[in-house]
Amino acid sequence: MAENMVWDPLRRKNVPLTPEERVRQWFITVLKDRMQVPLHMMMSEVGMKFGEGALKKEFRADIVVYDRRPGPMMIVECKRPDVELTKEVLEQALRYDMVLDVKYLPLTNGNRTIFCERLEDGNISFLK
């Protein structure tokens, strides 16, 4: 494997090792080893579309975690270590949530991780 590539166990292929990809692979390991999420219940780079016609835009969620019910339960938004976890990063994850309808929205840059929970009333709770 080339030095600038890394094996992605979710996509089952080598991918370029960018700073964001390093964070994504680290968080996949956290989910698998610390949170006991099986690899077969995760997907990375999940494509989705917003809007219609000329307004249609395509986006990709960094990591989506599924549970035993049909559908996803978590969207993980990964950023490079030098990117702050701002309101804009949360809003990006919330746009994905409009399509996937998940309960949990972790945001991470590898240095800091914020776990957000979407409540039934639509509000966001920041978990510790």
What are these regions (language model features)?
Residues 1-104, 110-128:
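A short, conserved, highly charged catalytic patch centered on acidic carboxylates
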